[in-house]
Amino acid sequence: MSTSNVEAVEVKKEDRRVRKTKRLLRSALTDLLKEKPIQEIKVREIADMVDINRGTFYQHYRDVYDMLNSIEDEIFIDFRTFFSNNSDSLEEEADHFFISLFTYMKENSELITVLLGPNGDPSFIERLENMVRDKCLNEWIVKYNVVNSKEFEYYYAFMVTGCIGLIRLWLNTEMVESPEEMARILERFLIR
């Protein structure tokens, strides 16, 4: 095996180990956020939970806030990709879009429940609202020929807050309804 092939294999192993370590750290932070706010969480607690030393933690993150921001950024990258992949078909296939959205929420329910919960990051919700606003509000104003943009902003705030509340309730009641069922419920509420 040539030196470059050995290096490529080592990089793959390192990448897998890094991914595993970050996944364990993410899980530990999620568990701790169920119990207390980020301000009370120490790097030592996270490191102890996943049986690593603090130095390993600091190879990946500056502190717990940097870690939380990094995790949130990953979610927003997923959301942006999600919106860009579905933006053209949103009207024709809203049910498909919402099913995909609720499926994503279910797959990441532990983390999203914590982020939307009492110990979560309030700026996460604000970033989520702003992202949807940037993606949808201006397009909707033009598309629906809105004359009173201020009134439409109130409508938007009302709808987004309601959607977030609906998602919170679903997550907090252990997602009894399927993503398909939740998509139908949300679509009915938005159309009324």
Region spans (language model):
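Basic, helix-initiating cap at the start of DNA-binding domains
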Residues: 1-36
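Alpha-helical structural segments
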Residues: 23-31, 35, 49, 66-86, ...
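Short, hydrophobic secondary-structure boundary micro-motifs
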Residues: 41-42, 113-115, 179
